Regions:
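Structured, amphipathic secondary-structure segments that form assembly/contact surfaces
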Residues: 38-144
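Core segments of small alpha/beta cavity-forming domains
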Residues: 1-68
Length: 144
């Protein structure tokens, strides 16, 4: 499953649209890693720049290894700060403690880095009329 545990109150229309763009990205990337069917159209529609390049690379690595993910993804949004009319920085915490990486036969693949929560600052930009995730700045793990 995919759950959003918290979103800040009092967002204006532009902040809300930027946040919806982030959620489109986050849900699309999670579904793509669960299905691993090669269809990245929803990811490509919600992602641009270095974030898209990085996702394609990591997806291909998992696809080549025959891996996919199962479990529950949880997201908390701390803030949505507009940088301009066409860019927002969204402070998020992704709880990946209930996500497992498995082989095509369903065997769990141990993660060398364990299961954690990840805190990121996400740049979302208005691109071709849609809010798309452009880049990430990692703040840390297990701090949210």
């Amino acid at each position: 499953g995919y759950y959003v545990d918290f979103v800040p109150q009092g967002l204006d229309a532009t902040q809300t649209q930027a946040l919806q763009g982030f959620f489109a990205y986050d849900r699309a990337t999670w579904e793509a890693y669960r299905k691993m069917d090669g269809d990245l159209s929803a990811v490509e529609a919600s992602t641009t720049g270095t974030a898209l390049e990085s996702y394609r690379k990591n997806y291909k690595k998992a696809q080549d290894a025959g891996e996919h993910e199962v479990g529950t993804a949880r997201m908390t949004v701390t803030s949505v700060e507009m940088q301009s009319d066409s860019e927002a920085i969204i402070d998020v915490c992704a709880d990946q403690t209930q996500i497992k990486r498995v082989t095509s036969s369903g065997e769990e693949i141990p993660r060398s880095h364990g299961l954690h929560t990840y805190s990121d600052l996400v740049s979302v930009k208005l691109t071709d009329g849609a809010w798309k995730v452009a880049s990430f700045e990692k703040k840390g793990k297990d701090i949210c």
